[in-house]
Amino acid sequence: MRVLLVNPPQAFYPGSDIPAGNLPLGLLYIAAVLEKNGHEVSILDAFMSDSSIWKSKEKTIIGMPGWRIREEIRKRKPEVVGVSNPFTSQVENAIAVCDIAKGVDPRILTVVGGPHVSAAPAQFLEEAKTADIVVIGEGEYAMLDILDSLARRENLSDVPGIAFRNGTAIVQTSPRPWLKNLDELPYPAYHLVNMEQYLEPKTIEYRSFKDRSISMITSRGCPFNCCFCSVHLHMGKSFRSHSADYVVNHIEHVVNKYRAKTIFFEDDNLTLDMERFEAICDKIIERGMRVNWETPNGVRADCLNPKLLKKMKESGCQSLFFGIESGDQEVLDTVIGKSLDLKKVIEVAKTCKELGLKTGAFYIIGFPGEKRENMLQTIEFALRLRANYDVGMHLFVATPSIGTRLYEQCRQGGYIKENLTSRSFAEARQAQGLPMIETADFTALEVKEIAHEAVKRYRRLSLLIHIKSPAKTFKTAFSQPSIVAKFIKSLYSA
């Protein structure tokens, strides 16, 4: 069958950072599996393949205008259009692509997948009248089964892991088992997109690095139970990973074929299996591969040790991000449910500084169950890590993503201060955020003020550190001037 997979344009609101221009890895994996099984597949990245910026009411849209998407669909004549919807804040753009596809030809089958629709499949189908099918969870073999079912004219009810319309009713099928052997997946179908758009930073003005870089995922699933996280809804709680050989062969492939110089490991639990990741580092070192790599999604500090960190540094690690979330141990244990020892965080931060590894950390404030003093303790912890171990602070406000324990807690407790919309989710994820949660212990405004003051203190501290380390500052300014420009701009906006 002829299949067109679409990454929709993306929207951002006043105060939001411009969405990052990464490879649509989910679509590339689906395309690879479909091609392997004889289907004719093309990909339309309507975000990255067109740099148009246009206004739509209160939001700004980046990417291909609707008329161009319409022309591409007409030209490619797909029987099935698959649409990616990774974030709740972008749901309107996914629906718009379905609308366009049905406008071109009502016979086109529209299939939507991603974290948002996995969390709320029936709700999405009720809202998106032009979407025919929703994929719940992993998409590669669900999409293949949908196509095979259509070709054989079989009942979609027999395809696990989907929801679809049956007249006026919405049918949700039995859950699809999670893919156990990730090594059976072919490499993403890189040949279906213009790789230079993603690899060459000069084509993406808002990137802060200069090397040719590519995103990669080496594992799926998370066995932990953080209240705010939705990864288990679309990737499961069972940790599954590619073998060390598969990962290093994959890295070698993108280095040799696409001249990639930096790998962004986008895993949710990259080092959960420390033996596996040590083997990956060993193989990179043994093969003499000249590649840098980073962990933008964060790693757990309790899944690291000095031996592994040394090998990570030797194998090309340039920076590590930690998912710390709170600097208050009680909040971590009883509110978030992260089961992370802050003493271990400090130990790992110290080792990273000794090894010369750049580090950053993610923090979140504004959870139900927190009080002002808990939030302030998180800020103080973050500032101490910055002052003592050069760990950057990336502060967010708690966001009740649909399908998470946090969302259910907020819904049942009446803590969500307004109707949930694409805009409210987008604004909640902005730097310093526009909080969506209010409890008897804090208002949304109080959380925003705490976050704003914390960022001001962090910037002042960072400025002092830069003044005390001029050589390091000049090196950064030379190698990554956009980071310095952004930092200077932030000082004036504080």
Language-model region placement:
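Radical SAM enzyme core and accessory elements
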Residues: R2-L5, E79, T404-C410, Y415-A494
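Proline-aspartate-enriched helix->loop->beta-strand connector
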Residues: K77-V81, A260, A387
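Flexible glycine/acidic-rich beta-alpha junction loops that bind and position SAM and/or redox cofactors
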Residues: D50-S52, S118-P121, G167, F224, ...
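N-terminal [4Fe-4S]-dependent radical SAM core
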Residues: V3-L4, P9-D17, V159, R165-S215
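Radical SAM [4Fe-4S] cluster-binding motif and immediate context
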Residues: N22, D183, A189-I365, E380
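Short catalytic helix/loop segments, enriched in acidic residues and glycine
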Residues: G21-L34
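Catalytic cores of alpha/beta
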Residues: P121-E127, G369-R384
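Glycine-rich beta-alpha loop elements in corrinoid/cobalamin-binding modules
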Residues: V33-L34, E40-N181, T399, G403
